[in-house]
Amino acid sequence: MKLKLLAKPIAVIGITLIGTILFILLSQPNQPSSKTDPMARSFVLWLHGLGDSGPANEPIKTLFSSPEFRNTVWSFPSAPSNPVTCNYGSVMPSWFDIHEIPVTADSPKDESSVLKAVQNVHAMIDKEIAAGTDPNNVFVCGFSQGGALTLASILLYPKTLGGGAVFSGWLPFNTSIIEQISSNAKRTPILWSHGMADRTVLFEAGQAGPPFLERAGLSCEFKAYPGLGHSISHEELQHLESWIKTRLQSSS
């Protein structure tokens, strides 16, 4: 479940559960400088997928070259190494346990390990807010297992944040979590993107997300990408950049 960044959504690269995957960084043309309203400090927390690492995902931030991101602090933490059930107990970077691959809408959930991971994510967010960042300028994003953790972290955070972006993720909890979602958390917008050719986290697992969020009282924008497998396309990241830009709060 390591991140693969594809130039085109129709290009699909096969993956193995514990193999290494080539990370392709797309070069971007220089953006002309422009005068914009003063932007306050913002924070983007990116959570990687199973078996991956934070540093391997850091090149993503170079794609966000708009002036609105000049005061953005990026964080790419790495998951701790844990035994993973779907990989026969192999120890690898993992935010929480996963019981089966492919992940479907009905896959078993390990809520206890998810909640432990959520506490760690909340600590990262709390630290940034304590440093002076407006919660409305805090964005949590994640791919695959990191996307599932993004969702859980957003829903259980006691404050309204700028937004949460889920890429090829799934619901890592049961419907009972709805009772734990605060009114503030329900005001945090969600962007959910999923490849229709995903054979690791099936598209049906992604499709189950928006109806659940709607029942919970949250706003979710769901985008399906035909031909895209278990990876992230340039198109998805371009939309993420635009989506965050429209939600950033200025310092004025």
Go through the PLM ranges and name each one:
Residues 28-137:
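Serine-hydrolase catalytic machinery in alpha/beta-hydrolase-like enzymes
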